[in-house]
Amino acid sequence: MTFESVEWGDPRAVALRAAMDVETTAMYASRAAGQTPEQDAAVSAALTIDPPTIVHTVLVIDDGRPVGHAALRPWGDELEVKKVFIDESVRGRGLSRALMLELERVALERGIHSLVLQTGDRQIAAIALYESLGYEPIEVYGAYTAIPFALCYRKSL
């Protein structure tokens, strides 16, 4: 397993984000069914990423194949972790933990000493991972306040 820094628009990164979107859309479909069009629009806006804001995108490469993805973007004087995803076929091997530690390394290399992130309450494995790595729950921030099931975390590095 290795890490490869890529541009946000790298086709392999785009494909992994698309797979993540399919998975999370299915995970939260029952919640979306009960929302108003205005709520849908607010959630969509909160989850939309403006590509020029991304300062680092990394892939997990396993046996020559891209199997994981994550990115960082500025959030005040911190960096925000975005789009952490490991392909289902390789889960359970510690790749997500290694990926998060790589993001922490990159942040420190950039002189950043705190990471924040947002996840959803149905992403139980992600929540367990973040908490096991020392991320602490914080108040829901920014546009994520429009997402009723949002959970936010911070870790001082």
Model feature map: region roles:
Residues 8-9, 14, 19, 23, ...:
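C-terminal "cap" of GNAT-fold acetyltransferases
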Residues 4-82, 87-88, 100-102, 106, ...:
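Acetyl-CoA-dependent GNAT
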Residues 70, 91, 127:
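Short acidic, gly/pro-rich beta-turn/loop elements at beta-sheet edges
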Residues 93, 97, 101:
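Residues forming the Rossmann-fold NAD(P)(H) cofactor-binding site
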Residues 87-93, 121:
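Active-site acidic-Proline motif in GNAT/NAT acetyltransferases
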